[in-house]
């Protein structure tokens, strides 16, 4: 099992935490330095054409990509301990919370998104920060509201 990783990647942290909880140790961790643009190198594009990490290669076949999909794969192939509750509603709730983080908040810290805002829309750094803070704030407020219920939070 090979994990393509970068130490500053929140998405990779999600996968590494899941692996740690399950006692899974990858055979190899391959560092893809996003700050140096290594995700754009042809060798990595063959692993993940989206040029994003994490990516996981487990045996034969194509690499797995996107942290939530990788975590579901790990949970299905290594069922104990489970990452998700047993009941369908509980699983859906956890997936919804994870998607707020992965889909609504996390992309705002990804360099390629911030670079796109700067180059395509001519946002200066304070404007990018203001934009990101607005959407982060909305996502965190939603998470706080969802997690306020002590029975399910």
Can you describe what each PLM-predicted range is?
Residues 1-128:
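GST-like domain detector, emphasizing the conserved glutathione-binding G-site
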Residues 80, 145-153:
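Surface-exposed helix-capping loop/turn segments at secondary-structure junctions
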Residues 105-110, 142, 149-150:
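Short, structured loop/turn "capping" segments at alpha-beta junctions
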Residues 129-148:
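Amphipathic alpha-helical packing segments from all-alpha helical-bundle domains
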